[in-house]
Amino acid sequence: MSITVETLQATSIVPNLTVDDVQQSITFFQALGFAVDERWEEGGTLLGVMLRAGETRIGLSQDDWKKGRDRKKGVGMRLFIATRQDIDQIAARAKAAGLALDVEPHDTEWGSRAFDVTEPTGFKLTVSTEQPA
């Protein structure tokens, strides 16, 4: 087995999710505490947004359905969102805004506190406190 040496000094990774209904997904992420940072429209139609929460960004793009309507999105992928904020308060705000949590806030085996939730298109998210050093 060979060991590779890190040569890329990346400063961030920004996922862009292709969603079924961009406005519905915006509402979902706003319930988690994200804010719209940029919007892209064409002819009055919302094509996508860049959301921001703290130092992180997530892009949302409206599916144009050119690849068909029967394809599954979000399969085999989970977004982990780490925060220094109180997980129980974030979960309570999300629930008050109408989100249904998949897993309620709980202590994890690696020492953080987390909850799970699914975005309307099917993308899975875990919102967690940062792992202890």
What are the roles of these predicted feature ranges?
Residues 121:
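C-terminal catalytic core of tyrosine-transesterase DNA break-rejoin enzymes
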Residues 19-23:
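Short acidic-aromatic low-complexity motifs
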Residues 1-16, 26-27, 31-118, 128-133:
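Vicinal oxygen chelate
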